[in-house]
């Protein structure tokens, strides 16, 4: 993981939060995601045509994925963190390989997560994927 672009402590803190979020689902504890999500978080489909709203629904999407998938590979690269007062945008490239119903999928793309700082705590408020490709 190249984190040379993460210069400030706040940028590094946000990247650490993003990694904690990913560790929750990747390591099989997706219910813990709720502590990182704002109550009204919005997940967008990669084409931005569909949305899921709310901490419970978005957390459940990870649970459903893990219940139907076996993760074979997951990597994050090129993190970028932009901070604007109480708003932050975290992006990174990812590669994932997983199995569902005896079929293996291999995808790459960019994850985009927007955070809002409330009472000295960063909460994820918006997420989407971009550049999603089957490898």
Task: Describe each region flagged by the PLM.
Residues 81-88, 115-121:
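A short, structured loop/turn motif at beta-sheet edges
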Residues 37, 94-96, 128-131:
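Short beta-strand segments enriched in hydrophobic/aromatic residues
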Residues 15, 30-83, 105:
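A solvent-exposed, acidic/Ser-Thr-rich amphipathic alpha-helical stretch
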Residues 26, 96-100, 115, 132:
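Beta-strand elements of well-folded, non-transmembrane domains
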Residues 5, 101-106:
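A short acidic/glycine-rich loop-to-helix N-cap element
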Residues 108-135:
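Short beta-strand edge/turn micro-motifs at domain boundaries
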Residues 21, 62, 76-81, 94-96, ...:
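Hydrophobic/aromatic beta-strand elements that line small-molecule binding cavities or substrate pockets
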Residues 1-39:
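Short, low-complexity N-terminal intrinsically disordered segments enriched in polar/charged residues
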């Amino acid at each position: 993981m190249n984190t040379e672009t993460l210069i400030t402590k706040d940028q590094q803190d946000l990247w650490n939060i993003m990694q904690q979020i990913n560790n929750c689902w990747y390591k099989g504890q997706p219910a813990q995601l709720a502590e990182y999500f704002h109550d009204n978080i919005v997940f967008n489909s990669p084409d931005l045509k569909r949305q899921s709203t709310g901490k419970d629904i978005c957390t459940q999407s990870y649970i459903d994925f893990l219940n139907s998938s076996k993760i074979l590979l997951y990597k994050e690269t090129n993190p970028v963190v932009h901070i604007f007062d109480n708003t932050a945008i975290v992006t990174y490239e990812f590669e994932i390989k997983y199995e569902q119903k005896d079929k293996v999928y291999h995808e790459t793309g960019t994850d985009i997560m927007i955070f809002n700082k409330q009472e000295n705590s960063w909460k994820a408020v918006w997420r989407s994927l971009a550049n999603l490709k089957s490898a």
